[in-house]
């Protein structure tokens, strides 16, 4: 349900309602050019999100101790890349809502939104020299390649109606979701004096984030309000609980057939969710989340073994919604 306050806030960020004069529309100044190009990007940036990546960067900085100016550069890079990926995801997934408001391409159009997302990638790249280390370009390129590899496989499985194995899915998640997490931590490690490697821990956290997100997509009322009810079913996505449910009884083609329909029918989606529940797939998600969180705690303990770092990993897991 869209509140009037949210709509007003969105409109205010994008400019006055009275609009420019006709000649200004035809011949915009440089500043207006920029606002036009950035409009889909700025629209999504102003919508309040969970800011998980920004909070995680802050949490890891308790260990890595970066100078404040470099920390802010890395946060800007990650925010731009994440927002760009959401703009494109919403187009590729035919999404209707993002953070409880209409998706950017439903307002600005698909072409302008794609251009704005691509523009954001280069705005992020433009920040790299501020870190003062040429390795930043290698890290940036490597993890953006990984992100697109992961997204490519996710789309391929969906569009070809091919159900991956759990192992294949988590490998894809490591590229797609883990890519931005790793990019942030690798840039932080590059700019830090520590010799600790936090990448294995971040890989685990990326898996935890995605498995929980897949679970909430089909189980959370708050998620439904922000993204739509059972959105992964409408998208036709092979998410973690859906993969488990299909593979629990391969002879039953009901769930895969529902995915093929890309249905908007809530009754059909409720039927699918009951079926997923009947195969123990939501319980399996909760079990795997507990196992992954235990692995993360153990890894953090092996790396540091101090009370401060134990508290740090608990704060990070808490941000991901995983409590001990």
Swiss-Prot record:
Protein residues bound to dimethylallyl diphosphate: 98, 176-177, 210, 217, 227, 237
InterPro entries: Isoprenoid_synthase_dom_sf, Polyprenyl_synt, Polyprenyl_synt_CS
Named cofactor requirement(s): Mg(2+)
Positions annotated to bind isopentenyl diphosphate: 50, 53, 82, 99
Biotechnology: applications noted: Diterpenoid pyrones display various biological activities and FDDP C shows anti-cancer and anti-HIV activities. FDDP C also shows inhibitory activity of 42-mer-amyloid beta aggregation that is involved in the pathogenesis of Alzheimer's disease.
Catalytic activity: isopentenyl diphosphate + dimethylallyl diphosphate = (2E)-geranyl diphosphate + diphosphate; isopentenyl diphosphate + (2E)-geranyl diphosphate = (2E,6E)-farnesyl diphosphate + diphosphate; isopentenyl diphosphate + (2E,6E)-farnesyl diphosphate = (2E,6E,10E)-geranylgeranyl diphosphate + diphosphate
Gene Ontology process terms (BP): alcohol biosynthetic process; mycotoxin biosynthetic process; terpenoid biosynthetic process
Residues annotated for Mg(2+) 3 binding in this entry: 213
Source organism superkingdom: Eukaryota
CDD domains linked to this entry: Trans_IPPS_HT
Sites where the protein binds Mg(2+) 2: 89, 93
Pfam families: polyprenyl_synt
SUPFAM superfamilies: Terpenoid synthases
PROSITE patterns reported in the protein's UniProt record: POLYPRENYL_SYNTHASE_1, POLYPRENYL_SYNTHASE_2
PANTHER family referenced in this protein's UniProt entry, alphabetically: GERANYLGERANYL PYROPHOSPHATE SYNTHASE, PYROPHOSPHATE SYNTHETASE ATMG, PUTATIVE (AFU_ORTHOLOGUE AFUA_8G02400)-RELATED
Family: Belongs to the FPP/GGPP synthase family.
Name of the protein this chain belongs to: Geranylgeranyl pyrophosphate synthase dpmpD
Species this protein is from: Macrophomina phaseolina (strain MS6)
Gene expressing this chain: dpmpD
């Amino acid at each position: 349900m869209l509140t009037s306050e949210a709509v007003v806030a969105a409109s205010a960020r994008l400019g006055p309602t009275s609009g420019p004069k006709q000649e200004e529309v035809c011949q915009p100044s440089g500043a207006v050019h920029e606002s036009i190009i950035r409009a889909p990007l700025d629209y999504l940036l102003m919508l309040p999100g969970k800011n998980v990546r920004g909070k995680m960067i802050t949490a890891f900085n308790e260990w890595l101790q970066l100078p404040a100016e470099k920390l802010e550069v890395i946060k800007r890079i990650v925010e731009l890349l994440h927002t760009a990926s959401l703009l494109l995801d919403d187009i590729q997934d035919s999404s209707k809502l993002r953070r409880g408001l209409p998706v950017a391409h439903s307002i600005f159009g698909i072409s302008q939104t794609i251009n704005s997302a691509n523009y954001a990638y280069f705005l992020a790249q433009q920040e790299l020299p501020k870190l003062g280390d040429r390795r930043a370009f290698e890290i940036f390129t490597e993890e953006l390649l990984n992100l697109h590899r992961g997204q490519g496989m996710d789309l391929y499985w969906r569009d070809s109606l091919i159900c991956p194995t759990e192992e294949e899915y988590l490998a894809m998640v490591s590229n797609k979701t883990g890519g931005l997490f790793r990019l942030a931590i690798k840039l932080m490690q590059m700019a830090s004096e520590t010799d600790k490697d936090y990448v294995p821990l971040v890989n685990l956290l990326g898996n935890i984030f995605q498995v929980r997100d897949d679970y909430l997509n089909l189980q959370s009322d708050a998620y439904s309000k922000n993204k739509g009810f059972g959105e992964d079913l409408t998208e036709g996505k092979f998410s973690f609980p859906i993969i488990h449910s299909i593979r629990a009884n391969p002879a039953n083609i009901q769930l895969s057939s529902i995915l093929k329909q890309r249905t908007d029918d809530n009754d059909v989606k409720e039927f699918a969710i009951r079926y997923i529940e009947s195969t123990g797939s939501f319980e399996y998600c909760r079990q795997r989340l507990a196992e992954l969180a235990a692995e993360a705690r153990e890894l953090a303990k092996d790396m540091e073994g101090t009370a401060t770092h134990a508290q740090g990993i608990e704060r990070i897991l808490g941000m991901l919604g995983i409590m001990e």
